[in-house]
Amino acid sequence: MTWTIEERAWDDAAGEALRAAQRAELDSRYGSDDHEPGAAPSAADIDVFLVALTSDGHAIGCGALRRLDARSAEVKRMYVEPAGRGSGVAAALLRSLEQAARARGWTTLRLETGPAQPDAIRFYEREGYRPIPLYGVYVGSGLSLCYERTL
């Protein structure tokens, strides 16, 4: 499978469809739609939104960055359709997000995932993210696991 990665607007239709698919998958895994502490990402607070497209133009994955402070950002809405998993597209999206973070002068990326996402946990650990204490809105959440990587 070949793909390209493009920066898109947060309200891009393909991106919205991918985020809806991610929400549906997470709702199923967690048994409800109440699995994300804090405010959901929005066009007002997302600095970078990337979409991975197959050679025929089908949007297969996405990921975003939300600035936390002058030196760090949070990875949000990382998602790859089931058909694209294991193809390397998630790693390519994450590397592209890391490159975008470096270009903005951010030296640290953080993220939140959860215990019902063992595949995501394995992926982030394989990509060099290490577990950290819960931060921000995730403090006290029994559904959150947080990770960080210094770029």
Where do the PLM segments sit?
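Active-site acidic-Proline motif in GNAT/NAT acetyltransferases
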Residues: E81-A83, S87, P115
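C-terminal "cap" of GNAT-fold acetyltransferases
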Residues: W3, E7-D11, T107-R110, G114-L151
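Short coil/turn segments at alpha/beta junctions that flank glycine-rich nucleotide-binding fingerprints
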Residues: R71, S87, A103-T107
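Conserved GNAT acetyl-CoA-binding A-motif
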Residues: L94, A101-E112
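Acetyl-CoA-dependent GNAT
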Residues: W3-K76, E81-A83, L94-S96, A100, ...
